[in-house]
């Protein structure tokens, strides 16, 4: 009875208020369309500030809503920027929405969780797959060049498959400045990025400021989070094939002297020095264009095939690719090729338990030439004088005899043999249990294994009299004699160096994610977990001399004909490192416009001395979504405005393993009873107090979106 009376009273009160308001309201009509093509848009039109009065458009984009003159309206549609406007008359409205350039509700992967762009309080940048695939690039990290503010990609090598250096907000240390790179949660180094097919990348998220402290002792140089493409539920399987074939050429060459210009200039120099002119006839024409001889057109091609789809419980994304690239210097002697296979699976084992699996296999082969600096092919190319031919009349390569440290670059390429092969296996097994609507427990095991085989062959070569690069004593390719000890000499012929190295990473992580909204105004998120990381590397290398027939075809250490094997040798290495971590993060949002986040991580690393192994890395950040304020007045021009601030402490553990231990170095070789015996000496003292570098970073940022078309991000930071 009491319920009925209460309902009757509310109904009576509502009816009375409606009757009073009806005298002051108008029936406003209008249509919402796409600004680009004027097609109808299904949208929600609500009255501000509280939005309790709202309506939706029909399939033609039309709506009708009871409003009052002076009311402010908010028009929202999925995939479009919102629009605010004021009611000034009863005339029908024509509202055009612009497609979102940046969807503020888009989910972005962060450390051990995810967030929407609107909720993020740190300085981050995201590159999507659409921006990557249109670039036709061989390496994933090249997608960041010019795409992300504060990120600089330095090319260490211009040859195919060459490495790059990624720098986020400049240099942080005199040591290793490489950022932490995670692909689907698996740790990669910058060299390992060669294994990825850029067409498989779904997104790249760059963490630039102190909020990267969730990754603790490895986050001082920034963090790059890469997600590969995954299957989507619903719909038929989708097959994609992408291919391109290209030709590469040098865009610009140096303006060097031709033969006649060189002869005239050199004659004048000798004349001014009171010496006889070296060229009796300077009418030599163009002569040899060494750049034209060395630089050539190089082919590159890429093919990739992928299938994406789902069944009742499983989504999948499967892909394979092939990429090859010749060098514009050296052709197939400077080549890179890559075969890649990838499988991403996500299976709902129960309604609350999900298994995510990632498998990646890559085979790479790379051939290289001497590069970067004195003695490289390009150094010899630009310093070779144009008055000398490529090949003499007797068929041998010209010696370039006038300068002792310059050799014929064509001969250099012909006698260079340097080949490396890599097999890489990467995977992740992740089990996510949805405990309830607010709590998820994730456990994952990652592995990253690489097998590297390399071979370098050094034949007997004669580049000309006085050349330091000669490995033979004369043009007849006679081998030099090497004195190992007094009265003990051996012939040193062509040599080969071979090595096999293995590297393996294992990671186990377990963490809880809590996400709950209290009432309409309070949103709380929290993460807590632990991580165990171990890395091991080992390798064995050997070199051998006197390879038969001075030929690459026989370049194997087993074929060595060195007398007694004295010239031959071997080397090895081994290292192991471990990292134990505990981490936590708490986030709070009030009315989705006042945001605050705190991070705390504790790391223990085996790289540091026993007195300084553990460190604590905190961070705090906050944001204010100004455009969500009821009194915000610039909505028609600046659709979105957010002010951010953050401060965090991160560490850097990029130092050699065992650096805190004493080191013995090999010193000298001595003959004892006709046996050659190496000596040792202390090369480095121990340091049990060796610890990580610490970086403190403060950041103040502003995010703006103007007229749903122009996105502006401003950051001011101090990093020390």
Model-predicted regions and their roles:
Residues 437, 693-719:
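Long hydrophobic segments that form regular secondary structure
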Residues 243, 322-326, 596-605, 647:
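Transmembrane beta-strand segments that form the barrel wall of outer-membrane beta-barrel proteins
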Residues 233-286, 328-334, 340-424, 444, ...:
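Surface-exposed loop/interface segments of Gram-negative outer-membrane beta-barrel transport/assembly proteins
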Residues 1-342, 354-356, 427, 462:
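Short, small/polar-rich motifs associated with maturation and membrane association
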Residues 94, 141, 165, 223-225, ...:
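Membrane-embedded beta-strand positions in outer-membrane beta-barrel channels/transporters
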Residues 69, 89, 350, 434-436, ...:
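Residue-level recognition of beta-strand termini and adjacent short loop/turns
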Residues 228, 241, 258, 305-309, ...:
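Residues on the lipid-exposed face of transmembrane beta-strands in outer-membrane beta-barrel proteins
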């Amino acid at each position: 009875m009491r319920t009925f009376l209460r309902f009757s009273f509310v109904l009576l009160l509502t009816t009375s208020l409606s009757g009073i308001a009806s005298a002051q309201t108008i029936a406003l009509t209008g249509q919402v369309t796409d600004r680009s093509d004027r097609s109808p848009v299904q949208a929600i039109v609500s009255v501000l500030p509280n939005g309790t009065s709202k309506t939706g458009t029909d399939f033609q984009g039309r709506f009708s809503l009871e409003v009052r003159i002076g009311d402010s309206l908010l028009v929202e549609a999925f995939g479009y920027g919102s629009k605010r406007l004021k009611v000034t008359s009863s005339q029908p409205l024509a509202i055009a929405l612009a497609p979102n350039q940046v969807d503020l509700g888009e989910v972005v992967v962060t450390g051990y969780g995810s967030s929407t762009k609107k909720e993020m309080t740190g300085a981050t940048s995201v590159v999507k797959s659409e921006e990557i695939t249109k670039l036709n690039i061989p390496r994933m990290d090249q997608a960041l060049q010019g795409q992300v503010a504060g990120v600089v990609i330095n090319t260490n090598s211009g040859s195919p498959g060459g490495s790059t250096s990624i720098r986020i907000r400049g240099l942080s240390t005199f040591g290793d400045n490489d950022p932490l790179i995670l692909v689907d949660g698996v740790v990669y180094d910058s060299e390992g990025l060669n294994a990825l097919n850029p067409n498989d990348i779904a997104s790249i998220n760059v963490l630039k400021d102190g909020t990267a402290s969730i990754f603790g002792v490895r986050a001082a140089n920034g963090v790059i989070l890469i997600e590969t493409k995954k299957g989507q539920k619903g719909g038929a399987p989708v097959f994609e094939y992408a291919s391109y074939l290209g030709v590469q050429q040098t865009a610009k060459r140096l303006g060097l002297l031709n033969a006649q210009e060189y002869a005239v200039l050199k004659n004048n120099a000798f004349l001014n020095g009171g010496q006889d002119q070296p060229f009796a006839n300077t009418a030599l024409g163009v002569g040899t264009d060494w750049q034209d001889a060395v630089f050539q057109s190089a082919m590159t091609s890429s093919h990739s095939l992928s299938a994406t789809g789902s069944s009742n419980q499983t989504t999948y994304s499967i892909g394979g690719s092939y990429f090859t690239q010749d060098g514009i210097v050296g052709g197939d002697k400077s080549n890179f090729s890559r075969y890649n296979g990838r499988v991403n699976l996500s299976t709902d084992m129960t309604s609350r338990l999900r298994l995510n699996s990632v498998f990646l296999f890559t085979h790479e082969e790379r051939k290289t030439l001497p590069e970067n600096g004195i003695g490289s092919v390009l150094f010899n190319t630009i310093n070779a004088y144009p008055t000398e031919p490529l090949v003499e009349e007797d068929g041998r390569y010209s010696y370039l005899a006038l300068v002792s440290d310059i050799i014929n670059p064509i001969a250099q390429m012909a006698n260079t043999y340097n080949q490396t092969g890599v097999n890489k296996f990467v995977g992740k097994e992740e089990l996510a249990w949805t405990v309830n609507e607010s709590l998820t427990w994730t456990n994952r095991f990652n592995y990253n294994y690489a097998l590297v085989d390399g071979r370098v062959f050094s034949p007997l070569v004669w580049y000309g009299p006085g050349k330091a690069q000669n490995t033979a004593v004369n043009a007849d390719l006679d081998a030099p004699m090497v004195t190992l000890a007094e009265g003990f000499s051996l012939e040193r012929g062509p040599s080969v160096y071979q090595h096999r190295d293995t590297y393996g990473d294992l990671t186990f992580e377990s963490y809880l994610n809590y996400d709950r909204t209290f009432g309409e105004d309070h949103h709380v998120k929290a993460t807590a977990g632990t991580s165990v990381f171990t890395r091991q590397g080992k390798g064995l290398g050997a070199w051998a001399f006197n390879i038969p027939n001075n030929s690459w075809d026989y370049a194997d250490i087993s074929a060595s004909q060195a007398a007694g094997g004295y010239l031959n040798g071997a080397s090895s290495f081994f290292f192991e490192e471990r990292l134990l971590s505990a981490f936590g993060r708490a986030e709070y949002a009030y009315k989705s416009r006042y945001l605050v986040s705190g991070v705390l991580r504790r790391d223990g690393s085996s790289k540091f001395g026993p007195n300084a192994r553990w460190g604590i890395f905190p961070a705090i950040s906050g944001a204010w979504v100004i455009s969500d304020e009821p009194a915000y007045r610039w909505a028609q021009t600046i659709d979105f405005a957010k002010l951010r601030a953050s401060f965090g402490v991160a560490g850097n553990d990029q130092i050699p393993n065992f650096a805190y231990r004493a080191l013995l170095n090999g010193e000298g070789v001595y003959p004892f009873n006709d046996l050659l015996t190496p000596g040792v000496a202390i090369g480095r003292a121990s340091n049990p107090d060796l610890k990580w570098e610490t970086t403190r970073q403060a950041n103040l940022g502003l995010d703006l979106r103007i007229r749903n078309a122009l996105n502006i991000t401003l950051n001011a930071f101090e990093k020390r």
